[in-house]
Design a protein with these regions (language model features):
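Mid-domain alpha/beta scaffold segments of enzyme catalytic cores
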Residues: 1-112, 116-120, 191, 237, ...
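Catalytic pocket-lining loop regions of alpha/beta-barrel enzymes
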Residues: 94-95, 103-218, 301, 305
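Short active-site segment of divalent metal-dependent hydrolases/proteases
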Residues: 9-10, 130, 163, 225
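Short aromatic-enriched loop/helix-cap "lid" or pocket-rim segments at secondary-structure transitions
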Residues: 15-16, 43-45, 82-84, 110, ...
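Ligand-binding grooves and catalytic loops that recognize ribose/phosphate and carbohydrate rings
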Residues: 37-62, 131-147, 230-247, 256-261
Length: 306
């Protein structure tokens, strides 16, 4: 099974188009994040985030086999715990995305929403590391997320391997490993969506694999919907090339492509039936223009990232 655990909604996508893109990329399950970066939505406007959550709820309704909807909340909002509960219990979303902009994960006033997430038993995805749109990344250093350990049982994923603080991110994830906590019970896992620019990618992923292992790493394209399946597939090709360079074995690849995210989402790991694609995920072909042998090839980065 292949899970894309990091897909941004814009508010302009339709369910059929999303599923077609996933089919074309041979992705079995997509984690759809409520829009917060596109026109009409803002992390600083709780009312717009409620509309965003309603939008993604409509997209995923009736397609829980293929789509997992994540709410977006601003934990500084005193009503955020209530909005989160409504998104999960009423709208049917299954997780939440948060972006530390103007708040630190250890701030006292954001702890109630983390406590509510723990009560709801949902996975959380956080932006970690630098931004590429000019915002300050000072709120998003991986060690700041250690405060979440005050809420044992949370299931947390830090995006982008915390780049440029990859070593910090690995250290945060390593604590449970040192203490002998089984992978499925570890608080932190990390998505390998492309925060690191090309010169850093192999080193960042290689270190994470060597220290944390594949059970704590999961694929996320960080694509912005609506997009073509070819765009998602291209980013998958980048990961395939890295895994080939690092000589990662088949079992570890299965965990990175889907097993780790399936456990994080509370799924059984069985691949649902796709609509149009009949090819096996293990038979993935890189896009023709994916220069697997050119590690210096620049990524086509957007001017927004989280």
């Amino acid at each position: 099974m292949i899970v894309d655990a990091h897909l941004h909604c814009s508010g302009a996508e339709r369910e059929d188009d999303v599923l077609r893109s996933l089919d074309d990329a041979r992705v079995d399950v997509g984690v759809l994040l409520a829009p917060f970066l596109s026109e009409g939505f803002s992390l600083d406007d709780p009312a717009s985030l409620r509309r965003a959550n309603e939008h993604v709820a409509r997209l995923v309704r009736g397609r829980s086999d293929r789509l997992a909807g994540f709410a977006v909340v601003d934990p500084r909002d005193r009503e955020a715990p209530l909005h989160l509960r409504h998104a999960i219990e009423t709208l049917g979303l299954v997780g939440a995305k948060m972006v530390p902009t103007g708040w630190y994960p250890y701030d006292a006033d954001v702890q109630p929403v983390f406590a509510e997430a723990r009560r709801l038993g949902i996975p959380l995805l956080f932006h970690s590391g630098i931004f590429i749109d000019g915002r300050s990344g000072r709120f998003c250093r991986p060690t700041f997320f250690e405060a979440l350990r005050d809420h044992p049982g949370l299931k947390v994923c830090l995006a982008h391997l915390g780049w440029p603080w990859v070593d910090e991110a690995i250290a945060v994830g390593l604590i449970d490993r040192i203490l002998g906590v089984p992978a499925e019970d570890c608080m932190f896992r990390f998505d390998i969506s492309f925060g690191p620019p090309p010169p850093y990618r192999r080193e960042a992923l290689g270190r994470a694999l060597e220290v944390l292992g594949p059970d704590l790493l999961q694929f996320g394209s960080d694509c912005f919907l609506p997009c073509s399946g070819a765009e998602i597939a291209e980013r998958m090709g980048w990961v395939h090339a890295l895994l080939d360079e690092l000589e990662v074995d088949a079992d570890a690849r299965k965990r990175i492509w889907g097993g780790t995210a399936a456990a994080w989402l509370g799924r059984d790991g069985a691949a649902p039936a796709r609509g149009t694609s009949t090819s096996s995920p293990s038979g993935f072909d890189r896009p023709a223009d994916d220069a697997a042998d050119e590690p210096s090839r620049p990524l086509r980065l957007r001017d927004v990232c989280c």
